[in-house]
Amino acid sequence: MPKMKTKKSAAKRFVVRPGGTVKRGQAFKRHILTKKTTKNKRHLRGSTAVHDSDLNSVRAMLPFA
């Protein structure tokens, strides 16, 4: 059986909390911000949790987290 490895691209994007939930950053906040409203940009601040349907995929990419 080959060695298990962490997907480094996923390790840079996700943080696993002690309770088991996975934290991720918000999308749509990098560029083309002039046409987005201030309210929209404000709501994109901070981080949010990964959706339940994506949790298994993210956890498979982070076997040691």
From Swiss-Prot:
It comes from the Bacteria. One of its GO terms (molecular function) is structural constituent of ribosome. One of its GO terms (cellular component) is cytosolic large ribosomal subunit. Keywords: Ribonucleoprotein, Ribosomal protein. Gene3D superfamilies: 4.10.410.60. This is Large ribosomal subunit protein bL35. Pfam families: Ribosomal_L35p. It comes from Paraburkholderia xenovorans (strain LB400). GO terms for biological process: translation. HAMAP family: Ribosomal_bL35 (MF_00514). Belongs to the bacterial ribosomal protein bL35 family. The keyword RNA-binding does not apply. InterPro entries: Ribosomal_bL35, Ribosomal_bL35-like, Ribosomal_bL35_CS, Ribosomal_bL35_sf. SUPFAM superfamilies: L35p-like.
